[in-house]
């Protein structure tokens, strides 16, 4: 039988692309420093939500304003992680604007 390979999949989400790229670079650098193999960061499609509101509360129905929120996503796979890798990732501090989901497989 084949031996099952260990893998950690990290999904990052955020509204600010600069913070997100900085966080992914920080995670990749930490994982490589501890000796694990890293695949990524893979940019996933950006979700764009548009909200349309009336400019005036009373009249001018045709006058509207649009706002948008873009949600940027990244995917990182860490192959063959060691105990040092997991400990280093636990100690890593990320900015508040970045949502992180970690799945071990």
Curated annotation (Swiss-Prot):
Q: Which UniProt keywords apply?
A: Ribonucleoprotein, Ribosomal protein
Extract one GO BP annotation from the record. translation
Q: Which domain of life is it from?
A: Bacteria
HAMAP family per the record? Ribosomal_uS10 (MF_00508)
UniProt source species: Chlamydia trachomatis serovar L2 (strain ATCC VR-902B / DSM 19102 / 434/Bu)
> Main role?
Involved in the binding of tRNA to the ribosomes.
Q: What is this protein called?
A: Small ribosomal subunit protein uS10
Gene3D superfamilies linked to this entry: Ribosomal protein S10 domain
User: GO CC annotations?
Assistant: ribonucleoprotein complex; ribosome
Q: Which InterPro entries would you find in this protein's record?
A: Ribosomal_uS10, Ribosomal_uS10_CS, Ribosomal_uS10_dom, Ribosomal_uS10_dom_sf
- In Gene Ontology terms, what is one molecular function of this protein? structural constituent of ribosome
Family from the record: Belongs to the universal ribosomal protein uS10 family.
The protein's assembly and partners? Part of the 30S ribosomal subunit.
């Amino acid at each position: 039988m084949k031996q099952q390979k260990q893998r950690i999949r990290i999904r990052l989400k955020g509204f600010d692309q600069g913070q997100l790229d900085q966080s992914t670079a920080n995670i990749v650098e930490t994982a490589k420093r501890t000796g694990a193999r890293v695949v990524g960061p893979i940019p996933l499609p950006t979700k764009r939500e548009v909200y349309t509101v009336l400019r005036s509360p009373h009249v001018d129905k045709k006058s509207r304003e649009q706002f948008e929120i873009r949600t940027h996503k990244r995917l990182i796979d860490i192959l063959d992680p060691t105990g040092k890798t997991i400990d280093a990732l636990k100690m890593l501090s990320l900015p508040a604007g970045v949502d992180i989901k970690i799945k071990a497989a």
